[in-house]
Curated annotation (Swiss-Prot):
The keyword Cytoplasm does not apply. Homodimer. Catalyzes the acyloin condensation reaction between C atoms 2 and 3 of pyruvate and glyceraldehyde 3-phosphate to yield 1-deoxy-D-xylulose-5-phosphate (DXP). Pfam families: DXP_synthase_N (PF13292), Transket_pyr (PF02779), Transketolase_C (PF02780). This is 1-deoxy-D-xylulose-5-phosphate synthase. Binds 1 Mg(2+) ion per subunit. One of its GO terms (biological process) is 1-deoxy-D-xylulose 5-phosphate biosynthetic process. Belongs to the transketolase family. DXPS subfamily.
Length: 620
């Protein structure tokens, strides 16, 4: 989209943060209004993360106005809220390409801009990285400042508290800004509290605070009295005692939509020594009423008409795999009161909304705490219950030791419903489900299933749920199912594949939902087609049968080739000294960038045409 200077006259003056800092303070509220309108205009045309960015407009302007970015280093946690940051840092005219193939990255990305200090996408990493960056800056000796912005969801994760505990110990000069849009303590936001925050962040209070401690530090009772008195005075109006105990100087909560007030407070805090903590209150979706009323729905949006206030409804076609899972979960829970379902803050995405409403006492959203989610499931299994952990492939990576140490070693019957496996599309490198088969396949006692359609997905969930000899996993992709008939649930024989088509010379061993593409290739090449179904245990007898009756084998999976299902087939053949040629088709050895699922599959030769061309070239 072309930039309309007449519509955004103040924003037109800002092509960099240096130009932003030349603006008079009085013009900044107008800049915020234009920035918010431009965000609405651009994201509604292109799609993308939306409500979070609307809530951080004033904070973004204030941070870049007060701090000398990019020399001073600004770190955004997760990055959903960083669209205004991208607009103000030289990427305004490209914001319409965000999340598209070849366009701006959906999150802050080091390779895209010098303003993006840390590449992000997963949550709760900012403070840990910020401490390292602050320590490096201190050793550099150039008075470079470090700021981390983290949301109220991300700060609940253990990694964030581990980092804050460390910061309190080594005391680097850094600022952590908590962007709190839950409104849980909104009654504390007002003129009095904003005034208090500016007072507490000012030089006079800081000098008195530190000076008083030095004077009386030799008198233990008085030192303790001063400490407790300060806590009680601040505790009457602020909820920051926890952060103070971790070693931070806590300021807030303050109004995160008062850009001039934020600038005053940030200027006061900029040169304070040691770890500082600023708590701001914002409203997700600020300035666009539909998003304010329903920030979850407007968190990430398709293209839509902003004048209507409504997002386009789905076409009502085939159900998503997430819905298939959610329906199975409800169906099973209605028959078995031992079922317990766990999600790390992904209720909507994992298809668990209906379950959470029907079975609230058996639904556990543990927040952004993947490690805890898995070990919590282990505890439920020890207690005789049947836990189902619904988790995205990319987020299960964060709980790998818990899967291994707390579940698999103890042979606990935990079912992992792994959503967003394979190529996920627009969120790019940080969110592709490229590695789960590789990192799970090497774990003893793990059963791993890859459905080729929605009916098989249901049967595998049922099979895993009733498998009591250890953990099991069913991995399925983002997107819609293929439209096959759903049959009554029954347990599948563990480790057994099925031949879908008999051909000559070539056998294609398919793992998962690339089956429709593999079927087209098999038909074109008159190849045998096998639905392997299980990655672990592999159907070794079927693999050896295919090797004995065909001149060559091809394995197909939407997972990294290295260590994936195809590697397992290779291992079986080598162990039995079968020298049959094997072509492994899957995800290559690099991080898959953003683009639609269709675009990326075509680029990576994972569509039917690409697979057939690759096989023909290999056979030639």
């Amino acid at each position: 989209m072309s930039f309309d200077i007449a519509k955004y006259p103040t924003l037109a003056l800002v092509d960099s943060t240096q130009e932003l800092r030349l603006l008079p303070k009085e013009s900044l509220p107008k800049l915020c209004d234009e920035l918010r309108r431009y965000l609405l205009d651009s994201v509604s045309r292109s799609s993308g993360h939306f409500a979070s960015g609307l809530g951080t407009v004033e904070l973004t302007v204030a941070l870049h106005y007060v701090y000398n970015t990019p020399f001073d280093q600004l770190i955004w946690d997760v990055g959903h809220q960083a669209y205004p940051h991208k607009i103000l840092t030289g990427r305004r005219d490209k914001i319409g390409t965000i999340r598209q193939k070849g366009g701006l990255h959906p999150f802050p990305w080091r390779g895209e801009s010098e303003y993006d200090v840390l590449s992000v996408g997963h949550s709760s990493t900012s403070i840990s990285a910020g401490i390292g960056i602050a320590v490096a800056a201190e050793k550099e000796g150039k008075n470079r400042r470090t700021v981390c912005v983290i949301g109220d969801g991300a700060i609940t994760a253990g990694m964030a508290f581990e980092a804050m505990n460390h910061a309190g110990d080594i005391r680097p000069d850094m600022l952590v800004v908590l962007n709190d849009n839950e409104m849980s303590i909104s009654e504390n936001v007002g003129a009095l509290n904003n005034h208090l925050a500016q007072l507490l962040s000012g030089k006079l209070y800081s000098s008195l605070r530190e000076g008083g401690k030095k004077v009386f530090s030799g008198v233990p009772p008085i030192k303790e009295l001063l400490k407790r008195t300060e806590e009680h005075i601040k505790g009457m109006v602020v909820p920051g005692t926890l952060f103070e105990e971790l070693g931070f100087n806590y300021i807030g909560p303050v109004d995160g939509h008062d850009v001039l007030g934020l600038i005053t407070t940030l200027k006061n805090m900029r040169d304070l020594k040691g770890p500082q903590f600023l708590h701001i209150m914002t409203k997700k979706g600020r300035g666009y009423e539909p998003a304010e009323k329903d920030p979850i729905t407007f968190h990430a949006v398709p293209k839509f008409d902003p004048s209507s206030g409504c997002l386009p409804k789905s076409s009502g076609g085939l159900p998503s795999y997430s819905k298939i899972f959610g329906d199975w979960l409800c169906e099973t829970a209605a028959k078995d009161n031992k079922l317990m379902a766990i999600t790390p803050a992904m209720r909507e995405g994992s298809g668990m909304v209906e379950f959470s409403r029907k079975f609230p006492d058996r639904y556990f959203d543990v927040a952004i705490a993947e490690q805890h989610a898995v070990t919590f499931a282990a505890g439920l299994a020890i207690g005789g219950y049947k836990p189902v952990v619904a988790i995205y492939s990319t987020f299960l990576q964060r709980a790998y030791d818990q899967v291994l140490h707390d579940v698999a070693i103890q042979k606990l019957p935990v079912l992992f419903a792994i959503d967003r496996a394979g190529i996920v599309g627009a969120d790019g490198q940080t969110h592709q489900g490229a590695f789960d088969l590789s990192y799970l396949r090497c774990i003893p006692e793990m059963v791993i299933m890859t459905p080729s359609d929605e009916n098989e997905c249901r049967q595998m969930l049922y099979t895993g749920y009733h498998y009591n000899d250890g953990p099991s996993a069913v991995r399925y992709p983002r997107g819609n199912a293929v439209g096959v008939e759903l049959t009554p649930l029954e347990k599948l024989p563990i480790g057994k594949g099925i031949v879908k088509r008999r051909g000559e010379k070539l056998a294609i061993l398919n793992f998962g939902t690339l089956m429709p593409e593999a079927a087209k290739v098999a038909e074109s090449l008159n190849a045998t087609l096998v639905d392997m179904r299980f990655v672990k245990p592999l159907d070794e007898a079927l693999i050896l049968e295919m090797a004995a009756s065909h001149e060559a084998l091809v394995t197909v999976e939407e997972n990294a080739i290295m260590g994936g299902a195809g590697s397992g087939v290779n291992e079986v053949l080598m162990a039995h000294r079968k020298p049959v040629p094997v072509l492994n088709i899957g995800l290559p050895d690099f991080f898959i960038p953003q683009g639609t699922q269709e675009e990326m599959r075509a680029e990576l030769s994972l569509d039917a045409a690409g697979m057939e061309a690759k096989i023909k070239a290999w056979l030639a």
